[in-house]
Structures are given as C-alpha cells and as structure tokens.
C-alpha cells in the first residue's frame, strides 16, 4: 500500500463509518479505525515486529483516532 494513501485515509474512513457508528445498538462497540489497527498488526507480523518499518501505519491509526475523538467531542 502506498504510504501517502495511508496518511490521507482517516477522515474518509470516519465519513464511511459514521452511519454504522451512529446507528449501532447502545450496547454495541464500533471502532471506525479498526482497519488501521489491523493494518498495523499485519505490518508488524510481516516485518518481524520491527516498529520502524510500520511507523506510517501507526501514524495513520493515531490520526484516525484523533479525528474520530474530535468528531465525537464536537457532536456532544
């Protein structure tokens, strides 16, 4: 995957996940950034747990989480 694409995705991921998150049952948990978490884990496995090789994936996950929490705070 192209590193630039990984960095640009968090906001679009939130927009795609927003309906699923807002329509979930009250007892349900939905993380729109789970895809980024999965990609990070796959990268770590692929690179023998070398964190330096996966820094773009980690940053994309952090950016997604930050965007998500900001959106939720603004909504409240």
UniProtKB/Swiss-Prot annotation:
It is found in: Mitochondrion intermembrane space. A motif (Cx9C motif 1) lies at residues 33-43. Disulfide bonds join 33-64, 43-54. Signal peptide: none annotated. GO terms for cellular component: mitochondrial intermembrane space. A motif (Cx9C motif 2) lies at residues 54-64. One of its GO terms (biological process) is mitochondrial respiratory chain complex assembly. Keywords: Disulfide bond, Mitochondrion, Transit peptide. It comes from the Eukaryota. Residues 30-72 form the CHCH domain. InterPro entries: COX23, Cys_alpha_HP_mot_SF. PANTHER family: COILED-COIL-HELIX-COILED-COIL-HELIX DOMAIN-CONTAINING PROTEIN 7. Required for the assembly of cytochrome c oxidase. This is Cytochrome c oxidase-assembly factor COX23, mitochondrial. The gene is COX23.
């Amino acid at each position: 995957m192209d590193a630039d694409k990984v960095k640009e995705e968090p906001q679009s991921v939130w927009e795609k996940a927003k309906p699923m998150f807002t329509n979930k049952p009250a007892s349900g948990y939905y993380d729109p950034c789970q895809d980024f978490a999965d990609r990070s884990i796959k990268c770590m496995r692929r690179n023998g747990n070398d964190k330096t090789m996966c820094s773009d994936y980690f940053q994309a996950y952090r950016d997604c989480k930050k965007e998500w929490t900001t959106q939720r705070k603004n909504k409240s």
